[in-house]
Amino acid sequence: MPGWSCLVTGAGGFLGQRIIHLLVQEKDLEEVRLLDKVFRPETREEFFKLQTKTKVTVLEGDILDAQCLRRACQGISVVIHTAAAIDVWGIIPRQTIIDINVKGTLNLLEACVQASVPAFIYTSSIDVAGPNSYKEIVLNGHEEQQHESTWSDPYPYSKMMAEKAVLAANGSFLKNGGTLHTCALRPMYIYGEKSSILSGIMIRAIKNNGILKVTGKFSTVNPVYVSNAAWAHILAARGLQDPKKSPNIQGQFYYISDDTPHQSYDDLNNTLSKKWGLRPDSSWRPPVALLYWLGFLLELVNFLLRPVYNYQPPFTRYLVTISNTVFTFSYKKAQRDLGYEPLVGWEEARENTSEWIGSLVEQHKGTLNTKAQ
């Protein structure tokens, strides 16, 4: 694949930035284009420093702007589509999430057809597979099993619809007579340095006398470190351009995990932060069944008040379910088809993330609430 080029949407995001750092190390990559709605000045500066043999072009534009996408796709070999509205808390309006995640993806697929981009990699989510019940148990699930979310909540619904559109587009004819080849990656919960979710959890704990809020003590999951999730995208980009590997990858989806130990979300947060004196809340926690039905009542209040007031429930049945379910998946198919092996081991991933959390503690320790003696 001599002289290839790549467009990454959502390039200013948590995963997107890590993909860029790996992409610029790729042999024969002539240009990487970075597209996001807006880039922070420090992110722009960081990307500017990556200019070496690979041309780095920073573009600001809206995923809903079809003309912008067509311009961004001109002369591109591979599109990696990570841009998404990520919200499992019910903060972003439903239609906004669906527009960005579904309509935006359809716009980008059409731009690829018009600009004759032959390869498209979609960053999907484990949420498209479920879980659909907190009683559901999936251990080392795989792609041959039928796991599909039945939730109507906008995030899992929109990601599932977008993934289906991407996989259905495989084999589409391009304007130049070529063929579009697509695949989708379903990362587990992604953790690591610069995670906005982890940052929020840790900063709230710092402001709460170092107490971590307990939200997922009944879960068993296998999170994936951000560099490993990014690495899978690089391998997918290579694979779709490899005449020998591509036929096995086209139209396929892959679960992306690594060797992070299977554990609860709360245990992960505790493991990553205990070095800095943060600790889990030891107070009584209602059983999951009670939380689930409380979530239903809160959703009912939201529905009844919607005509006059935008009430945001503190949690929903969906959030209770995904936070308290046994739901782990194997990466063997990605290993077989993409040649995927985790780039970073658990020990290094844990240390990197923990040190970053330490910097957050140092940065925010002035806001640490202390109990009266």
Curated annotation (Swiss-Prot):
GO terms for biological process: androgen biosynthetic process; steroid biosynthetic process. It comes from the Eukaryota. The keyword Lipid metabolism applies. One of its GO terms (cellular component) is endoplasmic reticulum. It is found in: Endoplasmic reticulum membrane; Mitochondrion membrane. InterPro entries: 3Beta_OHSteriod_DH/Estase (IPR002225), Lipid_A_modif_metabolic_enz (IPR050177), NAD(P)-bd_dom_sf (IPR036291). Keywords: Endoplasmic reticulum, Isomerase, Lipid metabolism, Membrane, Mitochondrion, Multifunctional enzyme, NAD, Oxidoreductase, Steroidogenesis, Transmembrane, Transmembrane helix. The keyword NAD applies. NAD(+) binds at residue 159. It holds the Pfam family 3Beta_HSD. GO terms for molecular function: 3-beta-hydroxy-Delta5-steroid dehydrogenase (NAD+) activity; steroid Delta-isomerase activity. The active site is at 155 (proton acceptor). It is a single-pass membrane protein. Its EC number is 1.1.1.145, 5.3.3.1. It catalyses: a 3beta-hydroxy-Delta(5)-steroid + NAD(+) = a 3-oxo-Delta(5)-steroid + NADH + H(+); a 3-oxo-Delta(5)-steroid = a 3-oxo-Delta(4)-steroid; pregnenolone + NAD(+) = pregn-5-ene-3,20-dione + NADH + H(+); pregn-5-ene-3,20-dione = progesterone. High levels in adrenal gland, kidney and male liver. Low levels in female liver. The chain crosses the membrane at residues 288-308. Belongs to the 3-beta-HSD family. 3-beta-HSD is a bifunctional enzyme, that catalyzes the oxidative conversion of Delta(5)-ene-3-beta-hydroxy steroid, and the oxidative conversion of ketosteroids. The 3-beta-HSD enzymatic system plays a crucial role in the biosynthesis of all classes of hormonal steroids. This is 3 beta-hydroxysteroid dehydrogenase/Delta 5-->4-isomerase type 2. It comes from Mesocricetus auratus (Golden hamster).
